[in-house]
């Protein structure tokens, strides 16, 4: 069975595994846990995504948990200002995960709490949600690993759990796989992209692409790294087509979105140490701009900028288990 197939099986069976484990504990005085698991399984069977809405900021409770949730939301909104040692670019979490992580066309975070742990082909391992958050810190924010045991990580996870309220374990909501896949298979033109950029993007991101206090840099030392999803042409085109310009999203054609993506990603940007070990089983998407197993780089940027502390930018991959024996991937 393929890794993708195992991931599908895992997601479909997690609610029932949880219920079975809780029932097994019932004889040890864990009847409350069993009842909770049965309730979770019942909710999974009756969950209707079309009528579900994520909680809003106004719904955050006024207690200790609510305080952690609010801190987590603040960290998403003001990431480099709050965590300058870990988010060293000009991007915030909400630069990509718009509407505080709830916008379906902008890599929504809703439901993430219910989907992890899960298998990630890029890392070739099953990872937890804290590791997935750190992939954003080290790649999309071109920063450093946020300690998983830190209060800040706990606050971020509290917020992700909050906006996933009532989503059944293992359930994939719309947008769960990240940015919406573009239906058109197009090739961006850098020269055309520059023209569109000058016409539609400079008001926020400036002619030099370095952005402003409110809008992030799109290339250079304070932008996303080559290891970020946004450094891939099709992924960037999807984000641009669905969400940009912010004042009139959806006004560009798919070809214009690909052209702008090609132009933006042709510029220098931070390196992503360890990127050559991505997709260890092969199968990297066609538009990945760096070499991996069996994959040649697709239109790499003009140059890569060295990271100040490369040893702090790599999220440790969980050990692979074969027949009960652990081995490093």
Please report, for each region that a protein language model flagged, where it lies by residue.
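Extracytoplasmic electron-transfer domains, predominantly the class I c-type cytochrome c fold
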Residues: 36-37, 47, 66-71, 75, ...
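Sequence/structural segment immediately N-terminal to covalent heme-attachment motifs in c-type
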Residues: 64-100, 185-215, 233-236
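Surface-exposed patches in mature extracellular/periplasmic domains of secreted proteins
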Residues: 81-88, 144-149, 169-173, 248-255, ...
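Secretory-pathway/luminal and periplasmic proteins that interact with or process carbohydrate-rich
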Residues: 82-85, 100-106, 163-168, 267-274, ...
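A structural motif
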Residues: 129-130, 160-173, 203-211, 229-236
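Short helix/strand-bridging catalytic loops that position acidic/His residues to coordinate divalent metals
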Residues: 178-185, 215-227
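Carbohydrate-binding/catalytic loop surfaces
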Residues: 281-293
């Amino acid at each position: 069975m393929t890794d993708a197939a195992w991931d599908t099986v895992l997601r479909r069976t997690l609610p029932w595994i949880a219920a079975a484990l809780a029932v097994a504990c019932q004889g040890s005085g864990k009847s409350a846990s069993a009842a909770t698991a049965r309730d979770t399984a019942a909710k999974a069977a009756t969950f209707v995504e079309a009528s579900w809405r994520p909680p809003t900021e106004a719904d955050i409770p006024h207690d200790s948990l609510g305080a952690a949730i609010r801190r987590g939301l603040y960290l998403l909104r003001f990431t480099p200002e709050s965590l300058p040692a870990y988010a060293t670019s000009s991007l915030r979490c909400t630069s990509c995960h718009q509407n505080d992580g709830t916008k379906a066309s902008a890599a929504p975070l809703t439901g993430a709490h219910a989907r992890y742990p899960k298998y990630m082909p890029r890392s070739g391992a099953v990872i937890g949600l804290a590791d997935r958050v750190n992939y954003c810190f080290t790649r999309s924010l071109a920063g450093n690993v946020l300690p998983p045991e830190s209060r800040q990580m706990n606050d971020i996870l509290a917020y992700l759990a909050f906006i996933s309220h009532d989503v059944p374990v293992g359930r994939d909501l719309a947008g769960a796989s990240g940015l919406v896949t573009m239906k058109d298979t197009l090739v961006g033109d850098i020269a055309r992209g520059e023209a569109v950029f000058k016409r539609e993007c400079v008001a926020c991101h400036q002619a030099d692409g370095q952005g402003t206090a409110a809008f992030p840099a799109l290339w250079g030392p304070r932008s996303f790294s080559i290891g970020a999803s946004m450094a891939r042409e099709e992924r960037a085109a999807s984000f641009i087509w669905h969400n940009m310009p912010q004042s009139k999203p959806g006004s560009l054609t798919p070809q214009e979105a690909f052209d702008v993506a090609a132009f933006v990603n042709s510029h220098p940007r931070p390196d992503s140490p360890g990127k050559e070990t991505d997709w260890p089983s092969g199968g990297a998407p066609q538009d990945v701009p760096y070499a991996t197993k069996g994959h040649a780089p697709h239109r790499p940027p003009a140059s890569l900028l060295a990271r100040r502390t490369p040893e702090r930018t790599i999220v440790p991959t969980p050990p692979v288990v074969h027949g009960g024996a652990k081995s490093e991937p």
